């Protein structure tokens, strides 16, 4: 019969507990993995499996579990995981923003519904673009790249009481501008053409006031918008590939800035 001593239990707890906090924090905020449609047991099981794979290669931390240092260490691991997952959400937020811009120009701003995944009121076109971005993210193996980047953080920023550089979180805050910038770049061709169409309808209304511009304008704008979206579809995949690559490079820069360099 195999007997396990209390020292062995304590060693395993120190070895697996701290990495598990960082992994679960990432899963709770990362794209796709944080969807409410995924059961919590599946998320917990995935986090435990990832931890069982990566933890044996990490040195055990001997911080007492019931201490102020352990509380600070737990907050640090959770903060690192949340920062990684939250940054990756910027790419999907940019695609959703593009869908909101296009839907607004198409006259679909009122076509909203409660998203079952996030329980937020979201435009239909934004949700379609978001689902397309999720499929492309899986196609490009983005989830594997994200887990690989998480593993790298354990070597770049080992589990310990060392503080995290605040410059990394400043870079994370500045990266929020990528949402509006990339969303506008993706939607700009459709917005420009639909704006031109609306200007033409406005001139037509001035030249022929007897025409009911509301009866003509909405079906025409909606039809042209659907045609433009069909033309835009082949360009979404390379755009998302470039966007995901940009976000992963940003994540790598943020992770590299997290350790505090004590060298003069």
Curated annotation (Swiss-Prot):
Question: Keyword Cytoplasm: yes or no?
Answer: no
Q: Does the keyword Transmembrane apply?
A: yes
Q: Entry's InterPro entries?
A: FliR, T3SS_IM_R
Domain of life of the organism in this record?
Bacteria
| Compartment list | Cell inner membrane; Bacterial flagellum basal body
Q: Show the Pfam families listed in the entry.
A: Bac_export_1
Q: How does it sit in the membrane?
A: Multi-pass membrane protein
Query: Quick one: a GO biological-process term for this protein?
Result: bacterial-type flagellum assembly
Alphabetically sorted, this entry's keywords are: Bacterial flagellum, Cell inner membrane, Cell membrane, Membrane, Transmembrane, Transmembrane helix
* Cellular component terms (Gene Ontology): bacterial-type flagellum basal body; plasma membrane
Residue spans crossing the bilayer: 45-65, 66-86, 131-151, 175-195, 213-233
Family assignment? Belongs to the FliR/MopE/SpaR family.
- According to its UniProt entry, what is the function of this protein? Role in flagellar biosynthesis.
| PANTHER family documented for this protein | FLAGELLAR BIOSYNTHETIC PROTEIN FLIR
Q: What is this protein called?
A: Flagellar biosynthetic protein FliR
């Amino acid at each position: 019969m195999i007997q396990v001593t209390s020292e062995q239990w304590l060693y395993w707890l120190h070895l697996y507990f701290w990495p598990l906090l960082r992994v679960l924090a990432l899963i709770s905020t990362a794209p796709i993995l944080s969807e409410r449609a995924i059961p919590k047991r599946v998320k917990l099981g995935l986090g435990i499996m990832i931890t069982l794979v990566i933890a044996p290669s990490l040195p055990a931390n001997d911080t007492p579990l019931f201490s102020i240092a352990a509380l600070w260490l737990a907050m640090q691991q959770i903060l690192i995981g949340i920062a990684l997952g939250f940054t990756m959400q910027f790419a999907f937020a940019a695609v959703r923003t593009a869908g909101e811009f296009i839907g607004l120009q198409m006259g679909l701003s009122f076509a909203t519904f409660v998203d079952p995944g996030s329980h937020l009121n979201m435009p239909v076109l934004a949700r379609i673009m978001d689902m397309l971005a999720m499929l492309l993210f899986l196609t490009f193996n983005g989830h594997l790249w994200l887990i690989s980047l998480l593993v790298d953080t354990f070597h770049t920023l080992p589990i310990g009481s060392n503080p995290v550089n605040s410059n990394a979180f400043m870079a994370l805050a500045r990266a929020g501008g990528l949402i509006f910038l990339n969303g506008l770049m993706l939607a700009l061709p459709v917005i420009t053409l639909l704006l031109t169409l609306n200007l033409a309808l406005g001139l037509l209304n001035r030249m022929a006031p007897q025409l009911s511009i509301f009866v003509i304008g909405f079906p025409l704008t909606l039809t042209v918008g659907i045609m433009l979206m069909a033309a835009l579809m082949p360009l979404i995949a390379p755009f998302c590939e470039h966007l995901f690559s940009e976000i992963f490079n940003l994540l790598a820069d943020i992770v590299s800035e997290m350790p505090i360099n004590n060298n003069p």
